[in-house]
């Protein structure tokens, strides 16, 4: 016997097969000693009862009593297969911890007490009556268990023991079995799941756990080992009631662990001696007519609680999980996936033969990834994706999908994503129906309108058909800008071809229109006239833009300038000169400059700018060809034909544009664009952004800006905003002062250099300054008080409609081309303060305000643009002298550089 110093865990399993009473229910005397052997349940002495309500109690050492009830339960009359025979087939197992030597010593002296009790019915339950008792010695079992060196050994015994009453008279027999096992020093190696450990017992901790064991092994053993006189093995296993074994006594330091379980006897159990004399009759009857097997089977299934298999030498049988309905997709060989029709996975509850897991639908790709595992073959995923269209299954599918709102929503989204209408409207869950609208309700214009409010507003004021005539390139770029709602940097070179999805119209917004009605009705009339003019221009341009690329050079310039009805003679001269310059040398440019010098300042500016552009184009014939190609050529759509590709801006149609807006803006812009390359463009207080021109692609950005501006800049970017309407009117009438030819020539030379620079930088995307917030009334507020010189008003007016839109293009171009013709052009359409080398261009561009800020720019006085201030700082003293008149008009910009300086209260409906 190997005794360990440390405590070890032991298991005692008990199973009661049956109890047989010889002479029926005896008349039990009331004895006080009964209460000593049972857990204290004090009550008045019970009266004898003729109905048998038995219970078997086990006392091991000082641990708590284990009670085992018949299948009917406690205090319930027992079902007797024959008089005096009660079948239990229930048991309990208990765990306790003791030192092996202590356990051996105690079990040698103290047996296992077995008590047969009578539990009379009543509430509260009366004290049980002792019917009989027997003592079972565990000395042999403990000796054998502890005799093995290795833990895990067990010793079991099974037999029939006589029951004696208090007088020592034999009243019957009890058939039971027990097994004592040594589980070693730890329980962790035996349990598969954690055990709750509530405190219990005198000095120990008690742990109750649920365990499972297969009843078949116990039944098999009983069939092999149970004597014929014992009940049939089918009733062997019975669920056992919880048992608490508390250890008391100082010598017993064990901890009792209780578990509900059926005892499973896998080890051979010794056949107990049966008292043939006492139970011969009962045994014979039992052998002839065993208890009802079926009733026992049901009881076993409902009452069995199995302990972990580690307690036994044989593993328990794994329970096969119940077969569950599977959702599968039945592949159809000839069918193809029909997500377009809104068909969904077919959900079938298949018989247990299909054990494949439920299929999953990949909502992201809209494809079913589940595979149906058929007995014969595994279907391909493509086949499994196929769906069936049988009417009954279709209805079931619909019902199933409607019960899964999220899956339904995903499927609906997929169908919408691929423009595939839903086959059945019922697929949409009622709670999600509000998320979806039929596509018919959504017109393509709605998406476009949502992209930009200004676009929708413009649609009301201007005809969309005219817009279509505008070159596709501009429309595509504008569409792109509108969707983003901001002027963004263009990614280089020629404008990318995009599918035009709607009519992009720019002009007065409803808000501005209403404001003009209240503040300046005359200005509103002027705007409407300009819009009509624009429509005519766009129609004419549309026809011209369709001309082949070979003719684009000539037609884009010659035709635009040759149109007499809208172009003054001076303008025609300028346009002709600029065209000639394009094809000819720069000498012609200087000549052209000389010619317009006689004309008004605006006309001169236009001519000079055009000549500069022509010179640049001429110097870079290859570039010019590229620019003029249909894809790359940026013909000024409505008012100004500006070729911004490769950073070149050709302000030709500025001449065509209305007298007020035509000349100055385009020409100046082109020059300024080229000069802006190396310089940082500082946005005015309104523009807010400081951009490095090198980083930005002036050509591309300017192109994008001009595109967006062409339709939209009229109202906002132009100084003719609602507040500046008086200014615009003046601009139309005002005659500009002559511009020095030096500037134009200088810009032309610099422009050529800039062109090469621009080509390099054209690959880069230019970052456009963000548009001014509509809520910044600073610019608009100060426009009214600002008195501008006629030259400025004229420049601003010209830039407002045409140049403003083109200026956005040219601004970007001008950033690279700052050195070329910074003078008036930058002022007019650029709120961004480009540091142009020519002062006049800068001033005009500043006045016109960058089309990027077109929404706010309409409210901004051209004078206020910080661009002008920056330009003034950067411009040479000569430029300042030359542009004294323009500078005089810039006083307002100096007055208000910060939004904090604005008096916003004067603007109705605006708050900061």
Swiss-Prot record:
Region (Disordered): 31-50, 209-239, 254-296, 335-366, 443-469, 730-859
Keywords: Cell cycle, Cell division, Cytoplasm, Cytoskeleton
Chief subcellular location: cytoplasm
Signal peptide (UniProt feature, chain positions): none
InterPro entries according to UniProt: MAP10 (IPR039302), MAP10_C-term (IPR026679)
Compartment list: Cytoplasm, Cytoskeleton; Cytoplasm, Cytoskeleton, Spindle pole; Cytoplasm, Cytoskeleton, Microtubule organizing center, Centrosome; Midbody
Regions of compositional bias (Polar residues) in chain numbering: 211-229, 266-295, 735-768, 841-859
Regions of compositional bias (Basic and acidic residues) in chain numbering: 254-263, 452-468
Single Gene Ontology BP annotation: regulation of microtubule-based process
GO MF, one example: microtubule binding
GO cellular component: centrosome; cytoplasmic microtubule; midbody; mitotic spindle midzone; mitotic spindle pole
Record's keyword annotation contains Cytoplasm: yes
Ranges of Low complexity composition bias in the record: 347-362, 796-807
Keyword Cell cycle: yes
Function: Microtubule-associated protein (MAP) that plays a role in the regulation of cell division; promotes microtubule stability and participates in the organization of the spindle midzone and normal progress of cytokinesis.
Subunit annotation: Interacts (via middle region) with microtubules.
Name of the protein this chain belongs to: Microtubule-associated protein 10
Annotated organism of origin: Bos taurus (Bovine)
Encoding gene (name): MAP10
């Amino acid at each position: 016997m190997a005794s360990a110093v440390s405590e070890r865990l032991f298991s005692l399993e008990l199973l009661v097969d049956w109890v047989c009473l010889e002479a029926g229910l005896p008349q039990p005397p009331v004895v006080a000693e009964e209460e000593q052997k049972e857990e204290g349940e004090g009550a008045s002495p019970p009266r004898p009862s003729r109905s048998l309500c038995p219970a078997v109690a086990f006392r091991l050492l000082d641990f708590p009593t284990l009670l085992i009830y018949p299948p009917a339960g406690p205090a319930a009359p027992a079902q007797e297969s024959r008089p005096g025979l009660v079948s239990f087939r229930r048991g309990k197992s208990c765990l306790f911890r003791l030192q092996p030597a202590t356990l051996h010593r105690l079990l040698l002296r103290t047996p296992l007490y077995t008590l047969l009790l009578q539990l009379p019915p009543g509430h509260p339950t009366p004290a049980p009556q002792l019917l009989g008792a027997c003592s079972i010695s565990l000395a042999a079992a403990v000796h054998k268990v502890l005799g093995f060196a290795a833990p895990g050994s067990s010793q079991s015994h099974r037999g029939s023991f006589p029951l004696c009453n208090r007088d020592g008279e034999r009243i019957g027999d009890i058939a039971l079995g027990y097994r004592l096992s040594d589980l070693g020093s730890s329980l962790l190696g035996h349990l598969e799941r954690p055990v709750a450990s509530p405190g219990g017992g005198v000095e120990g901790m008690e742990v109750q756990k649920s365990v499972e064991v297969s009843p078949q092994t116990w039944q098999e053993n009983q069939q092999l080992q149970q004597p014929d006189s014992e009940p049939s093995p089918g009733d062997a296993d019975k669920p056992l009631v919880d048992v608490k074994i508390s250890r008391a006594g100082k010598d017993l330091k064990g901890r009792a662990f209780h578990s509900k379980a059926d005892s499973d006897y896998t080890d051979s159990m010794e056949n107990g001696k049966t008292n043939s004399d006492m139970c011969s009759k009962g045994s014979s009857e039992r052998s002839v007519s065993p208890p009802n097997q079926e009733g026992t089977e049901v009881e076993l299934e409902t009452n069995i609680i199995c302990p972990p298999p580690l307690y036994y030498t044989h593993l328990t049988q794994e329970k096969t999980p119940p077969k569950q309905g599977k959702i599968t997709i039945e592949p159809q060989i000839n069918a193809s996936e029909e997500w377009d029709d809104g068909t969904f996975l077919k959900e079938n509850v298949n018989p247990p033969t299909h054990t494949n897991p439920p299929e999953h639908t990949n909502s992201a790709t809209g494809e079913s990834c589940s595979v149906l595992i058929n007995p014969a073959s595994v279907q391909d995923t493509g086949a499994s994706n196929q769906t069936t269209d049988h009417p009954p299954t279709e209805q079931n599918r619909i019902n199933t999908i409607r019960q899964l709102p999220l899956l339904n929503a995903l499927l609906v989204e997929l169908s919408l994503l691929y423009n595939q209408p839903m086959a059945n409207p019922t697929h949409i869950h009622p709670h999600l129906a509000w998320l979806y609208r039929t596509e018919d309700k959504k017109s393509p214009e709605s998406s476009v309108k949502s992209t930009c409010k200004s676009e929708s507003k413009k649609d009301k004021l201007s005809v969309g058909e005219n817009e279509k005539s505008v070159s596709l390139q501009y429309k595509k770029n504008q569409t792109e800008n509108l969707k983003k709602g901001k002027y963004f940097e263009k990614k280089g070179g020629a404008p990318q071809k995009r599918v035009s999805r709607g009519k992009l119209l720019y002009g007065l917004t409803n808000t501005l229109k209403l404001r003009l009605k209240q503040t300046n009705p005359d200005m509103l009339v002027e705007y409407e006239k300009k819009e009509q003019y624009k429509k005519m221009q766009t129609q004419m341009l549309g026809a011209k833009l369709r001309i082949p690329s070979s003719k684009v050079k000539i037609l884009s310039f010659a035709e635009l300038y040759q149109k007499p009805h809208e172009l003054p003679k001076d303008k025609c001269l300028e346009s002709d000169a600029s065209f000639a310059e394009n094809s000819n040398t720069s000498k012609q440019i200087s000549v052209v400059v000389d010619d317009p010098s006689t004309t008004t300042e605006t006309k001169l500016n236009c001519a000079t700018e055009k000549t500069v552009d022509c010179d640049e184009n001429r110097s870079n014939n290859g570039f010019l060809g590229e620019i003029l190609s249909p894809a790359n050529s940026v013909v000024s759509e409505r008012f100004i034909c500006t070729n911004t590709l490769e950073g070149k801006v050709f302000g030709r149609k500025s001449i065509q544009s209305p007298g007020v807006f035509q000349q100055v803006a385009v020409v100046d812009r082109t020059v300024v664009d080229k000069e802006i390359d190396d310089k940082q463009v500082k946005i005015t207080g309104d523009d807010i952004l400081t951009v490095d021109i090198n980083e930005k692609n002036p050509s591309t950005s300017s192109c994008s800006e001009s595109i967006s501006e062409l339709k939209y800049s009229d109202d906002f970017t132009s100084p003719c905003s609602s507040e500046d309407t008086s200014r615009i009117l003046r601009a139309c009438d005002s005659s500009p002062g002559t511009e020095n030819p030096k500037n134009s020539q200088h810009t032309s030379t610099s422009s050529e250099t800039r062109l090469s620079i621009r080509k390099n930088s054209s690959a880069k995307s230019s970052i456009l300054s963000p548009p001014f917030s509509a809520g910044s009334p600073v610019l608009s507020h100060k426009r009214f008080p600002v008195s501008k010189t006629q030259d400025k008003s004229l420049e601003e007016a010209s830039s407002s409609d045409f140049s403003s839109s083109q200026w956005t293009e040219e601004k970007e171009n001008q950033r690279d081309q700052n050195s070329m013709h910074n003078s008036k052009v930058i002022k007019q359409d650029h709120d961004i303060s480009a540091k142009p080398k020519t002062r006049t261009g800068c001033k005009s561009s500043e006045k016109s305000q960058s089309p990027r800020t077109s929404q706010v720019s309409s409210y901004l006085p051209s004078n206020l643009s910080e661009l002008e201030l920056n330009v003034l700082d950067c411009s040479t003293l000569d430029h300042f002298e030359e542009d004294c008149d323009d500078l005089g008009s810039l006083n307002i910009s100096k007055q208000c550089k910060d939004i904090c300086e604005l008096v916003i209260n004067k603007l109705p409906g605006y708050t900061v």
